[in-house]
Amino acid sequence: MIEAANSSGQVPRKVKILLTASFFSALATVGQITIVGKQVYDMTGSELNLGLLGLAEFLPLALLSPFTGPIADRFDRRKVFSFALLAEALASFLLFLYVASEPSSVLPIFGLIALFGVARAFAMPASRALPIDWSPDDVVERVVALKSVAFQAGIIVGPALFGFIFVAGASFPYLAAVISYLIANLLLLTVGPSSIKRLATTGGRQAFRDALEGLKFIRKSPVLYGAISLDLIAVLFGGAVALLPAIAEDRLGVGAVGLGWLRAGVGIGATIVAVTLSVRPLRRDIGKSLLTAVAVFGCGTIVLGLSTNFVLAFVALMVLAGADAVSVYIRASLVPLATPEQMRGRVLAVEGVFIGASNELGAVESGLTAAAFGLVGAILFGGVGTLAVVVIWWRFFPALRDVKDFSEVRPDSSEPS
C-alpha cells in the first residue's frame, strides 16, 4: 500500500480505473453464469446439474490456488490479471460458438466452465490485491467498499442485461461477455505496475513452501481464521442463489427476463449496502456486526424458501444480499489490513479458495439437497444451517466476536513476510 503520508484522503485515479475494470469483469462473469445456469436447467431439468455447474468452476480454483497466489506475489499483478481476463474472454467465445450450434449435450458446457474456472483461479488473487496495492493506508476501507460497489453494480447490470440479450438469441449473451472482458482488459492496461516488492523467484520445494505460507498465516490468526471459515460454512449452507433457475421456473413461473431480475435483485440489495458503507464505514463492533449480518443472511434464505410470490422473493434476495455485502465488506477489509503487503497474493489466494468453496460448493450442496429433499426443503435446510453456524462461531471464536475496530488487526511493521 502507498503510505498514508502521501495521501490526500482521496481515492487515486488508477484505483478508480481498476474498480471500473472490476465492474466490467463482474458484469460478464455473473451475467454469463446466470445464463449458463438457465440453459443447463432448460436442457436437463435437474437441480443437481446446477450444483455440478458450480463445482466445475470451483475445482480449478481449489487445485491451482497453491500456485496462483505465489504467482500474484512474484509477478506484476496487472499482467497476471490481464492474461486471466483474456483467458476468460476465450472461454466465453467458445461458449458462444457451442451454444450457437444448438447443442443437445451439456457436457461441453461443463468443460468450458472448467476452463473459465482456470482463468478465474489466476484472476482472483491478482485482481483483489491490485486496488489495495495502489491505495494509501487511510483510504483502504473506503476502497474495499467501493470495490464491492463496483462488483455489485456488475451483478445488477449483468444478469438483467444478459436476460434481455438472451431473448434475442441464446448465444448472444456470451458474445456480450467477451466484449465486457476485453473492455476490462483495455482499462487494466492503462494502469502501470505498482512499486510493491515482489517475492523472489524460486523453484521446486521452496515454491511449494511459499504457497503454504498463506494458509499458515491465516491459521495462526484467530480473527482471519474465524472470519474466513465463517464465510465458508455459512454460505456453504446458504447457497440458494444457485437454485434461482429452478426457483424462477418451478416456484414463481417466470422466464429468462424474470430470472435476470431475480439475480439482479441480489446485486441491488448488495449495492445499497455497499454504497452506504462507502459513505459511512463501520467503525465499531466489527466482529458482532459480522456475525449479525450472517444471521440476517440465514433469515433471508428461509423467507426465500417459503416464497411463492415474485415480489416477496425479490425482497428476500435483496435482504440476504445486503446482509452478505456487510459480511463481505468486513472480511475484505480484515484480510488485507491484517496481512503484510508481500504476502497478500498468497493469503488472498487461500481466501479465494474459501470464497470459491463457499459459493460453488454451496451450489453443489443446494443441488444435492434439492435432488434429495425437494427445492423448498433444500433452501430451508440451508437457512436454518446458517443460523446454527452463527451460534457456534459466536461461542467458539471470541477473538473474532470481540473485534471493535479494523485498526486492531493491523500487523506489526516488523512482522516477517
Ranges and model annotations:
Residues I2-P60, K216-V266:
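Helix-loop boundary and gating motifs at the non-cytosolic
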